[in-house]
């Protein structure tokens, strides 16, 4: 049995074990308002699936959270390159990035409500949470570039496009990929947290809050499943697309052929 298959079996067995613990705990408590069983939670999710409102909420939240992520990706790359090129930019951004990393998400959400509407809150919060993670990742990648290759590129006066492909991208992309894996999870958690506090109509966060105040524990767990699933699916899709982009940019596909 290969390692990958063995690992999948281990993960499946662990998942079954913890679902069994959850089921046993729900049966022992015997109060659905405190803890529903996994069967009940999945049943509630199945009831939500045919509803148009369910999919509208997913589209509303996913669109805004992913917009924040995209803005974070673009901004972090530009700022990281600028910080590596100019010391004054590095000095200017260092305290800002440290402040964003150190400040609790809830504090940002409450402060941001003063400046933006509830419907735009998840965009801003997702952006802020992603920015320092990817900024650090890109800086790390730039710092790991082979200096000898850079000197050779300068001596032979390679054009910028060739330098990017031969030196900078091979150094930056692995760190960027790892940073994206972390940032995607953070942006989903922080984005939904922003919606729970900002309560924009038609969002997943609004649905979570309504389930909480009506003591609909099954619906609360169902929406939590949805958030976890969305985060995992978008992470897998984005990283798969990024892998293909990396292969295309670095010429790996051509080499394999």
Show which residues each predicted segment covers.
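C-terminal transmembrane helix and the adjacent membrane-cytosol boundary/short C-terminal tail
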Residues: 87, 178, 222-257
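Non-cytoplasmic
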Residues: 179-229
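Periplasmic/extracellular loop-to-transmembrane helix junction in inner-membrane transport proteins
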Residues: 2, 28-70
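Transmembrane alpha-helices
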Residues: 124, 128, 161-193, 222
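N-terminal signal-anchor transmembrane alpha helix
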Residues: 5-29
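Transmembrane-helix boundary motif in ABC transporter permease subunits
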Residues: 67-97
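Generic hydrophobic transmembrane alpha-helix motif, especially the helices
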Residues: 98-133, 140
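Short cytoplasmic-facing helical segments at TM-TM junctions of multi-pass membrane proteins
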Residues: 137-176, 208
């Amino acid at each position: 049995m290969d390692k990958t298959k063995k690992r999948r079996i281990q993960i499946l067995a662990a998942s079954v074990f913890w679902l069994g613990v959850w089921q046993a705990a729900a049966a022992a408590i015997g109060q659905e308002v405190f803890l529903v069983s996994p069967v009940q939670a999945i049943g509630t999710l199945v009831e939500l699936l045919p509803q148009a409102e369910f999919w509208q909420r997913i589209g509303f939240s996913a669109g805004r959270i992913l917009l924040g992520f995209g803005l974070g990706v673009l901004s972090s790359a530009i700022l990281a390159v600028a910080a590596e090129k100019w010391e004054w930019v590095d000095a200017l951004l260092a305290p800002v990035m440290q402040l964003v990393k150190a400040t609790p998400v809830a504090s940002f959400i409450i402060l941001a409500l003063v400046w933006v509407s509830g419907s735009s809150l998840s965009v801003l919060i997702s952006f802020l949470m992603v920015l320092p993670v990817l900024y650090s990742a890109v800086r790390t990648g730039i710092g790991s570039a082979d200096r000898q290759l850079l000197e050779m590129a300068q001596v032979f006066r390679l054009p910028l496009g060739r330098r990017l492909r031969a030196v900078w991208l091979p150094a930056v992309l692995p760190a960027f990929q790892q940073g994206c894996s972390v940032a995607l999870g953070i942006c989903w958690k922080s984005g939904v947290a922003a919606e729970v506090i900002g309560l924009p109509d038609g969002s997943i966060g609004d649905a979570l809050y309504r389930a909480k105040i009506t003591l609909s524990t099954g619906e609360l767990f169902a929406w939590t499943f949805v958030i976890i699933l969305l985060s995992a699916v978008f992470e897998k899709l984005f990283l798969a697309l990024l892998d293909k982009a990396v292969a295309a940019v670095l010429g790996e596909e051509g080499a394999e052929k």
